[in-house]
Amino acid sequence: MGEFVRVEIDQAIATIRLERPPMNALNAQVQSEIAAAAAAVSDDQQVRGVVIYGGEKVFAAGADIKEMADASYATMAQDSRRLQDSFTAVARIGKPVVAAITGYALGGGLELALCADFRVAGEGARVGQPEILLGLIPGAGGTQRLPRLIGPARAKDIVFTGRFVGAAEALAIGLVDKVVPDGEVYQAARDLVGRFANGPAVALRAAKQAIDEGLDADLDTGLEIERLQFAGLFATEDARTGMRSFVENGPGKASFAGR
């Protein structure tokens, strides 16, 4: 798809593959290509799940510091908007998304992984938000998505110290969902997202939107979001198929068309 970001589709699973060696630094071009890849997999009706992968050695080691070093306030005010928008495009993919984390996921790399629904890490993976060591703070969602995932105190520890978090600790605090041997990360991520590939695509999208949008709202608003999504699914073929199959054959045996 792009020079540094490829989209590969196999058996209804799309892989957004970062390829900017040696560390997949997230420069402006990579950011734009990530946004384009997110749009492509969102629009492709044949895609039922997405894996974000940086290769066997590294997920992404953050922003390109050389590119940022001489930036002015005015320049960064504009550039940071592009960065946030590119990651938000990933967070808004209306399908299950799994980040397959090998090696380092630091700074913008971790912030990209936070945009996924689930994170699978290799045993040797290390994640963190080291921007404070540069006299900065996270600028692509780290101060917002991280505390929503692991709580404010743990997020402040990671952001304030800039320390690297190993895979075992990341699993213990809920920062990643599964840890596997380093050589098995990509397949484990595919296996995880593959659980949803034959599911009711419209209902999965509705569930994701209801949860994600509800987290940014008060309870009453969240319940209203849920109610509208729930009611809307009664207009889908999948809901009719699922309920009919339940009555006739019992739970878990429906074959969904994604409509």
Please annotate each region the language model reported.
Residues S32, Q46, G54-A89, A105, ...:
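Glycine- (often His-adjacent) and acidic-residue-rich active-site loop
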Residues I13-R17, V51-Y53, S72, V98-A100, ...:
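Structural motif
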Residues I16, E33-I34, I52, D64, ...:
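Terminal peptide-recognition signature
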Residues M1-I13, D43, G162-A168, Q187, ...:
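C-terminal alpha-helix plus adjacent terminal tail
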Residues Q29-E33, R82, A89, A188, ...:
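Charged catalytic carboxylate motif
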Residues A91-L204, T236, T241-R244:
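Crotonase-fold acyl-CoA enzyme core
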Residues M1-G55, T88:
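Conserved CoA-thioester-binding segment of acyl-CoA-metabolizing enzymes
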